[in-house]
Amino acid sequence: AKKINELLEKNYDAQKGFVNSSEHVDNTNLKTYFKSKAAEREKFADELKREIISFGEKPIDSGSITGDMHRTWMNIKSALSSNDEEAILEEVQRGEEASLEDYNEILEETSLPESTKAMITRQRNAIKNSVNNAKRYEHIVS
C-alpha cells in the first residue's frame, strides 16, 4: 500500500499541476485539455484512495507533504511564470511521461492483487494516451 500511496500523492501533484496550467494559458483548447486532465487525475486519486482503504491502510490526503510538488511537476512552475504556452505544454508532457514510469514501476511488482493491477493498468493506459494526445497540441502553441 505504501507504493500506491506514493502514486496517490503523485496524482494529487499532477492534478494541481494541470489546474495551475489551465489557469496560465489563453488557448481555449489547451485550457479545456488541462482541465479535463485535472479531473481525470482527481478521479484516479479517488480510485487509488478506495484501493488503499480496502487494504486496511490510511491514504494520504493531499499532495507532497513538504508542499513542494513532485520533482516532475516542479519545472512547470517556472514555465507558468513565463506564461509561455509551449513551455507549459512541454513540462506537462514531461510530467506525464514521468507518471508513466511511476505506473510501470508499480506494475512490475508481482505482489499486487489482480483487481489493483487492473485498475493501475487502466490508469497507466489513460496516461499513455494523454502523452500521445498532448503531441496534437504542439502545433497549436508552436
Question: What is each of the regions a protein language model found here?
Answer:
Residues 1-26, 87-111:
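Alpha-helical bundle segments that constitute or directly flank the non-heme di-iron/ferroxidase center
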Residues 4, 26-29, 47, 118-126:
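Soluble, non-transmembrane catalytic domains of enzymes that act on hydrophobic metabolites at membranes
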Residues 7, 14, 21, 44, ...:
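Amphipathic alpha-helices that form helix-helix packing interfaces
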Residues 18-25, 52-55, 80, 107-110, ...:
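Secondary-structure edge/capping motif, primarily at the C-terminal ends of alpha-helices
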Residues 31-39, 63, 67, 90-93, ...:
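Short, charged, amphipathic alpha-helical segments
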Residues 32-66, 137-141:
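Conserved alpha-helical segments that form or flank metal/cofactor-binding pockets of metalloenzymes
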Residues 50-100:
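Carboxylate-rich helix-loop segments that flank metal/cofactor sites and access channels
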Residues 88, 92-142:
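Preference for long, well-ordered alpha-helical segments
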